[in-house]
Amino acid sequence: MADIMDIKSILYTEKSLGLQEKGVLVVQTAQNMTKNQLKEVFKTYFGFEPLKINSLKQEGKVKRFRGKLGQRKSFKKFYVKVPEGASIVALGA
């Protein structure tokens, strides 16, 4: 079973802040986490079930560093539709 420690952070970008007004939370997680595991984490630790969950894997960008190619880390993020009136105090949202 997934643990709350598998949720790395809440993403705060222009897009995610706009989505928060509509009740959607953008969460960065461990790469092997699934939608069902994330749903269980929200039920267990926050006391509500998300209305909808969308996921995507974002590949790390290839960047040059001192003339050599490197790659940023890849990560997985979820768009979580939160029910009205639910709050996520433990993660700072």
From Swiss-Prot:
UniProt cross-references to InterPro entries, sorted A to Z: Nucleotide-bd_a/b_plait_sf, Ribosomal_uL23-like, Ribosomal_uL23/eL15/eS24_sf
Keywords tagged on the record: Ribonucleoprotein, Ribosomal protein, RNA-binding, rRNA-binding
Protein's UniProt name: Large ribosomal subunit protein uL23
Record gene name: rplW
GO-annotated cellular components: ribonucleoprotein complex; ribosome
Function, as annotated: One of the early assembly proteins it binds 23S rRNA. One of the proteins that surrounds the polypeptide exit tunnel on the outside of the ribosome. Forms the main docking site for trigger factor binding to the ribosome.
GO molecular function terms attached to this record: rRNA binding; structural constituent of ribosome
NCBIfam families linked: PRK05738.2-2
Family: Belongs to the universal ribosomal protein uL23 family.
Subunit structure comment from the entry: Part of the 50S ribosomal subunit. Contacts protein L29, and trigger factor when it is bound to the ribosome.
Example of a GO biological process term: translation
Gene3D superfamilies according to UniProt: 3.30.70.330
